[in-house]
Amino acid sequence: QLAVNVDKTAEPEGKVVLNLEGLTLSNDSVAPIYVEAIGDEVQISAKNGTTNTISDGTSHTDTYVDSDGNTNPVNGAIFSRDDLKLKGKGTLIVNGNTEDGIVCKNDLKIWNGSITVNAADDGIRGNDSVRIGDPDATDYSTLSVTVNTNNGSTGGDGIKSNSTETDKGYITING
């Protein structure tokens, strides 16, 4: 498991960049990429000309405790409790075999790259927001997002955002 946990008090503007260059990462029992805490955001960058694959198994054993003290399952191959940005000119394939592919409990941004998500339930989930396509870009030729869900009767979604806060829970697609 590749885990990110940065002390928000010591590093309130903390940022971590994960440069993927032909990575294949899998874990049968926990999320292969897990972001516990970060001050600003974690960026996952698929480098130009590379294909990167992140896959989880069919059952997760990992959980986290939220700010209300509730224990929740970690239910994505890429799972972030804080802001997450996906970018780069390479290819990222995410296989969410347990439940979801990419899960972000805050803001999820997919700026560019070729992203394919295969999920047992929801493909891409951003609790506060999902934003696809850098709003400052003028060329979206390096952006491609494909979501495949194999959810049978569970009613999974391709792209999902839902928040109890009235100004959150939205999806924006530029391109």
Residue ranges of model-derived segments:
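A composition-driven surface/loop motif
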Residues: 1-175
